[in-house]
């Protein structure tokens, strides 16, 4: 074999494939020990692998314990990018009220909403309905987790706004915070916002009792899909400006159909169950 050919073979045999220097540099810059600076206060940048792990872990954890609001919040942030939270942000940008919300950046908390003022409003007003729901469920406006894992600062606010408005959705629909009520409301939110977390939360229906699952499939699922698709996008509601409006008028304006009172249904079912047990014991004795 000619020397030049042998030399060429040796040269090919010693070739090494190297990554572009820019790729190596970016990988070094974005490691667990050396992250890029946050884009806003409290922001925690994540790699694609970390975001996937967060999504899987929080999904499993929240399914095992649907009351873990922190895991549900993490699941919402991990699955909202790269598409869905931008779609929701664009829906706000295409709406005059949504644009004002993005410009004003209002927050919903006990510091921005006076509970005393809300209780002074007419019984059928949005504000009174909201505070009455808070009192009945034993919760407050400060219970929402702060967004940390969404990279875009404006989209982080959109997620925060959705999160802080969640209790208004509860109040307007009348759904309680029991797992059955949360699954029904999350189904409505999925049809209305398309956020993946709201759709994934529907898997919690597996943890419901048989009679609750039957009620979900026959009553709440059809209501949620019908009302969620037909109503205007609730992310564009400036709730702070609707507090004095009649709640039925707002439902009609948004196209939201109120479902049957779930708490009353559950109370009635418990009474019927107790009556049946009492009758059975009386018959046996």
Curated annotation (Swiss-Prot):
Zn(2+) binds at residues 166-167, 170, 182. Pathway: Cofactor biosynthesis; ubiquinone biosynthesis. Residues 1-11 form a transit peptide. It is an enzyme of class 4 (lyase). Its EC number is 4.1.1.130. Belongs to the COQ4 family. This is Ubiquinone biosynthesis protein COQ4, mitochondrial. The lineage of its organism: Eukaryota, Fungi, Dikarya, Ascomycota, Pezizomycotina.
């Amino acid at each position: 074999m000619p020397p030049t050919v042998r030399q060429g073979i040796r040269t090919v045999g010693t070739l090494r494939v190297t990554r572009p220097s820019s790729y190596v540099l970016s990988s070094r810059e974005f490691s667990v020990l050396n992250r890029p600076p946050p884009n806003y206060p409290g922001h925690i940048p994540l790699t694609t692998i970390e975001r996937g792990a967060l999504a899987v872990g929080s999904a499993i954890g929240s399914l095992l314990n649907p009351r873990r609001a922190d895991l549900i919040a993490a699941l919402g942030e991990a699955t909202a990018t790269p598409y869905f939270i931008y779609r929701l942000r664009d829906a706000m940008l295409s709406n005059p009220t949504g644009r004002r919300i993005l410009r004003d950046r209002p927050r919903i908390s006990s510091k921005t909403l006076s509970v005393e003022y809300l209780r002074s409003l007419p019984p059928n007003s949005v504000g009174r309905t909201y505070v009455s729901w808070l009192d009945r469920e034993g919760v407050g406006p400060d219970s929402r987790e702060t967004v940390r894992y969404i990279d875009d600062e404006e989209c982080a606010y959109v997620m925060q706004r959705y999160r802080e408005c969640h209790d208004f959705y509860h109040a307007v629909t009348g759904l309680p915070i029991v797992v059955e009520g949360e699954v029904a409301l999350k189904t409505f939110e999925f049809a209305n916002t398309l956020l993946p977390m709201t759709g994934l939360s529907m898997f919690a229906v597996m943890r419901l009792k048989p009679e609750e699952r039957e009620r979900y499939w026959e009553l709440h699922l059809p209501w949620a899909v019908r009302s969620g698709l037909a109503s205007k996008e609730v992310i564009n509601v400036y709730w702070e400006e609707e507090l004095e409006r009649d709640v039925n008028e707002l439902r009609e304006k948004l196209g939201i159909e109120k479902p049957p009172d779930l708490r009353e249904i559950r109370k009635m079912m418990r009474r019927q169950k107790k009556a049946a047990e009492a009758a059975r014991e009386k018959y046996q004795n």
